[in-house]
């Protein structure tokens, strides 16, 4: 395995003592992992939920997933030829964008590909994402799932939520006989439409969790060959 470039001094940005200690800890953990594992993969983790991270960590016992401020992770890798911790490692930083995690592992490339190509979780849609379905709340009594399941299997939405629906979510609701009601069907969004904050909150309120979350892996570094290779696992293709 190629020797590390340990002689380079890297200065982290000025910050408070606790924040600096945390940056130094992450920095040191990255470099220790680089000396321990054969591969390091760049995972794109924008909008990731805590349970997803827990699942991945539990599935990859024996490997190490590190997260932190992107600039700290990049500095630990080395952003230039002169600063890189190992030969050609600086080339990996060009694949670091948004919220990232570094997965260090001795598992084979095929194992990594198979796991992350198969891994998928349903999640609530975020603002600026595309609506997974056309969602319309039927007229009449407003039920907790907004018409997604038969009313015999559902329950009316709690009347205490009516001000939230009317004022925060701008739905034309009223209270009739103690029940939240709509005098006409209310269209929340159409499939493929770009969601605003209000629409995303309404979908969450009615339990619409149909957005698919997948981990994107853009590239990896091989410690033995000192090479960076592009992967593009789960990368969305441009329309």
From Swiss-Prot:
**Where is it mainly found?**
nucleus
Instruction: Mention one GO molecular function.
Output: RNA binding
Localized where? Answer: Nucleus, Nucleolus; Cytoplasm
Gene Ontology CC: cytoplasm; nucleolus; nucleoplasm; preribosome, large subunit precursor; small-subunit processome
Keyword vocabulary terms for this entry: Cytoplasm, Nucleus, Ribosome biogenesis
* Protease among keywords: no
Highest taxon in the source lineage:
Eukaryota
> What processes in GO biological process is this protein linked to?
nuclear-transcribed mRNA catabolic process; ribosomal large subunit assembly; ribosomal large subunit export from nucleus; rRNA processing
**Family statement:** Belongs to the universal ribosomal protein uL10 family.
The record's subunit annotation is: Associates with the pre-60S ribosomal particle.
Q: What does this protein do?
A: Component of the ribosome assembly machinery. Nuclear paralog of the ribosomal protein P0, it binds pre-60S subunits at an early stage of assembly in the nucleolus, and is replaced by P0 in cytoplasmic pre-60S subunits and mature 80S ribosomes.
Q: What is this protein called?
A: Ribosome assembly factor mrt4
Organism of derivation = Candida glabrata (strain ATCC 2001 / BCRC 20586 / JCM 3761 / NBRC 0622 / NRRL Y-65 / CBS 138) (Yeast)
Query: Which gene underlies this protein?
Result: MRT4
């Amino acid at each position: 395995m190629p020797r590390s470039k340990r002689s380079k001094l890297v200065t982290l940005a000025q910050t408070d003592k606790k924040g600096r200690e945390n940056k130094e800890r992450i920095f040191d953990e990255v470099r220790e992992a680089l000396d321990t594992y054969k591969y390091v993969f760049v995972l794109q983790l924008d909008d990731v939920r805590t349970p997803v991270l827990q699942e991945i960590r539990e599935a990859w016992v024996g490997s190490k997933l590190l997260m932190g401020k992107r600039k700290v992770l990049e500095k630990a890798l080395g952003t230039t030829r002169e600063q890189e911790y190992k030969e050609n490692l600086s080339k990996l930083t060009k694949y670091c964008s948004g919220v990232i995690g570094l997965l260090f592992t001795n598992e084979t490339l095929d194992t990594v590909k198979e796991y992350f190509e198969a891994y998928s979780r349903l999640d609530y849609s975020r603002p600026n994402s595309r609506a997974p379905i056309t969602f319309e709340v039927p007229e009449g009594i407003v039920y907790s799932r907004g018409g997604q399941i038969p009313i015999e299997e559902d329950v009316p939405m709690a009347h205490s939520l009516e001000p939230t629906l009317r004022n925060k979510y701008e739905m034309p609701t009223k209270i009739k006989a103690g029940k939240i009601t709509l005098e006409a069907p209310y269209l929340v969004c159409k499939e493929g439409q770009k969601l605003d904050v209000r629409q995303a909150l309404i979908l969450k309120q009615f339990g619409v969790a149909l957005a698919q979350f997948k981990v994107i892996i853009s590239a990896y570094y091989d410690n033995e060959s000192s090479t960076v290779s592009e992967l593009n696992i789960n990368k969305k293709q441009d329309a």
